[in-house]
């Protein structure tokens, strides 16, 4: 089992990683929800099936893919944070 200081350091690293993910996710969401953009889930074609004019479809698809990856990774990091925080509380209780 890691020492309390090591556990705290790992928690700080995980928290910083999660914050970076949240920052990138917010930037992507802002780009995709600008006026004229399709958003995170909107259609990329019009009612007739043609691509939406003035929208870089490759960029939108890339952003959506990256957002989905970040969302999944964020969930994993959050679970790891919860686990390590519980372990830290357990360690702190044992050392008292």
Residue spans of the language-model regions?
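Intrinsically disordered, Ser/Thr/Pro/Gly-rich linkers and terminal tails that flank
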Residues: 1-96
């Amino acid at each position: 089992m890691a020492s309390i200081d090591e556990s705290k350091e790992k928690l700080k690293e995980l928290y910083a990683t999660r914050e970076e993910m949240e920052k990138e996710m917010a930037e992507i969401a802002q780009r995709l929800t600008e006026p004229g953009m399709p958003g995170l889930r909107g259609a990329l074609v019009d009612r007739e099936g043609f691509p939406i004019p003035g929208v870089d479809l490759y960029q939108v698809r890339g952003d959506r893919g990256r957002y989905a990856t970040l969302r999944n990774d964020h969930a994993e990091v959050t679970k790891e944070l919860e686990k390590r925080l519980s372990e830290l509380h357990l360690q702190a209780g044992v050392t008292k």
